[in-house]
Amino acid sequence: MAIDKLPLLLFLSILLCLNRPVLSDTDEEDILLTGINSYRTTQNLTILSKNENAECLADEIADQFKNKPCTNDTGSATVPGTEPQFANYPQILAKCHLNVSDTRDGSIMPACVPRLESNLVLTNFTKSQYSMSLNDSKFTGIGIGKEDDWIVVVLTTNTPEGSYSTATPTKQESNGFTFGIGLVSYLVIFMYSSFCFFLF
């Protein structure tokens, strides 16, 4: 009797191990990307595609603003030419495997919005000095990072000076990690099914 249930048990075990839950996490970054691309569509511009290296830089820049309060002279309200300068900018670029020549034509736009309320976040980019960059057709890619009340948008171009393209793609690294987990799962399933086979 138990041997009759073995194929069903094996099938269910394999099915459970292969079934990887997909987490649907709609966050401020995704909402902002959708809003910016909708805005660009209404301006008859192409949508911006995600750029992982720009996203890395946006995350690192947002981290620099950690615990910095929102004021009338921070973020999108900053007077041009008075933007914060980071002494460790070369190290920030290095963390993302970038250098100054790969980012020269790009644009870094920080905004501070209490609790990152989505409508206000989008307005901080579309109804401020940042709208000039969003309306510029030279930009083709985007990276978004956030920390506390800060959200940073990095725009990229398709030129060598603004492509943010020198980093090793993180997808390759993560695919290797996924493959490693998948291989372990298959080995565990194989060992489990072999054990069950010899047990009965």
Curated annotation (Swiss-Prot):
The keyword Transferase does not apply. It comes from the Eukaryota. Glycans are attached at residues 44, 72, 99, 124, 135. Keywords: Cell membrane, Glycoprotein, GPI-anchor, Lipoprotein, Membrane, Signal. It is found in: Cell membrane. Its main location: membrane. One of its GO terms (cellular component) is plasma membrane. Residues 175-200 form a propeptide. A lipid is attached at residue 174 (GPI-anchor amidated serine). It is a lipid-anchor; GPI-anchor. Residues 1-24 form the signal peptide. Belongs to the UPF0277 family. This is Uncharacterized GPI-anchored protein At3g06035. It comes from Arabidopsis thaliana (Mouse-ear cress).
